[in-house]
């Protein structure tokens, strides 16, 4: 249905409506009959329109399909740089017919897409002719390429022509189009760019780039060598590309961004030719002012050399090294490479004189995630009840791209939930909780170990109150109350050992610990580690800790550690795989395995207590055979806290039975107190199995219509479910606790 018509609402004002989808990328302006008559325009007449949000665009006049006055719709495909179409009202005096004589010659500056590589001038001109065919253009305006149109060109800057296309000119089939050799003046005006969570890294990169680009002669006079190449390393999605573009914009440098895989050619020598062409183009830009060449995914272009079948890659690496060595002649030329696999780069590329400096962007910390969320949600209608600090705590391991996807999914949930109120949707906390189910951290994908857990609350574990308190003191309290711990001179333990009889909820306690801490959780078992190949198990364990350090705060859980690690004092001869895995674990606990590329951030004195503690990695191990563990693992500084998880006493068994029967229709004749007294030597797993068997007996007796579990069903279940613990085992653990490990356990 057409909107209500009128001559001109609010006097001589036209209401600006969104462009008709059928008019996208046509450069058309839809007007009513009265506006046509007022302007004296004809069908297809060029119009120069001043936009209410700033800037102007060049369109052709076309009548509205519903012939309603008082409204205007336009497609700003040819507009001034930075122009933006926003809803509002514009006056009739903002619409001016302009003459557009046919152009004999037109000069443009193409803006290439990042993945375009180094296309030839003929390929670029072919796309330019197709894009500008039979269109009006204006000097200083930018013509954008429609989305989905293939080709290397993203946009065109109109530089000039004959006759001068100011205020307008018409491109005809006879117009001779050439590519300008001079870039447009200040295509992107410098200004501070909001980089959520990257301000510290941006400052480091900005200082590295600003000095050689702005003060090359002064540095040469002082005899200082400035870096010619900078390598950005970090996981995918942290914002490496965005950071380089923002810093180049702020420093006023001309940015030439290239995706390294796009330079790969199919025929021999084509890749080297593309690389030379890109460097030549960057040096031409440097001859006119500061220039920055950005090579994204540089590891695809310069992999580690070696092997008989890698001759083509070796030639490409040699070509890049030669070109990097020749940069010193251009004082206003800097190369920036980005990779998420720095270890795959050829070592010759990472020496001084080529990539002199390396800037590491790690997975965002707590404060950085909060800053990123503030930037992303600044233009979103979020509820005032949403605590971004709490969201930042819940998004451990999320990079900038993950947080963007999370907010986008939350917005979609809000939109679908409020379909009837789409004019003013509001994003609530429930929308973010729903989005958490669909958006997982990208850094957890394709990783060793279980990265996600089914949430378990402390209240779902019956008994063991002393053990729960000790676990909270060791892990939860340092993360939630860092200032109090710092005031008392306390530090978080490096490692925790849980030992006790089987079935006493050791693994469930760790799951509850990970649920309450909002930290990354990595669970590793023996099957994940052991491999038939020599050295593979140690490599996997190192990778687990590297992954955990990249997603701090992190909790690494090694279940049944006695089956994973060996002891150098009992029953082994020589150096088997288990002893080598033990050696790697000891080194990781001591911090020997931390690589330089994983360190990030500033000095600890410049960080808040919470930010420091949230960078920690804690290991929790569980076993029912602590007597076979190596003594070096049990000393303070490695597994600082050793906690005995005892079998439940009568009070603990009663608490466990209450938890197990919480969702079970138990009859009034059932006495949980008597059951707790009759189940001596039952572990927590045995009690849960007992309740399940009683429920099954109720179904067997009364059929599928059964509604109650009575005392007789529990009595029958006691005849089949036997305790898994024996007096001998309990005596063994009690003696072990009192004699063998008492010096490390503070009871």
Curated annotation (Swiss-Prot):
Reactions performed catalytically: ATP + H2O = ADP + phosphate + H(+)
Entries under SMART domains matching the protein: AAA
Matches recorded under Gene3D superfamilies: 1.10.8.60, P-loop containing nucleotide triphosphate hydrolases (3.40.50.300)
Superkingdom of origin organism: Eukaryota
One example GO MF annotation: identical protein binding
Binding site for ATP 2: 500-507
A Pfam family annotated for this UniProt entry: AAA
EC code: 3.6.4.10
Location in the cell: Cytoplasm; Cytoplasm, Cytoskeleton, Spindle; Nucleus
Residue numbers binding ATP 1: 234-241
Regulation: In the context of 55LCC heterohexameric ATPase complex, the ATPase activity is stimulated by DNA binding and inhibited in presence of RNA.
Chief location bin: cytoplasm
Record-level GO cellular component terms: cytoplasm; nucleus; spindle
Tissue note: In adult ear, expressed at low levels in neurosensory hair cells (inner and outer) and supporting cells (pillar and Deiter cells).
Residues the record lists as N-acetylmethionine modifications: 1
Assembly and binders: Part of the 55LCC heterohexameric ATPase complex composed at least of AIRIM, AFG2A, AFG2B and CINP. Associates with pre-60S ribosomal particles.
Functional description taken from the UniProt entry: ATP-dependent chaperone part of the 55LCC heterohexameric ATPase complex which is chromatin-associated and promotes replisome proteostasis to maintain replication fork progression and genome stability. Required for replication fork progression, sister chromatid cohesion, and chromosome stability. The ATPase activity is specifically enhanced by replication fork DNA and is coupled to cysteine protease-dependent cleavage of replisome substrates in response to replication fork damage.
Annotated family: Belongs to the AAA ATPase family. AFG2 subfamily.
Record-given protein name: ATPase family gene 2 protein homolog B
Organism for this UniProt entry: Mus musculus (Mouse)
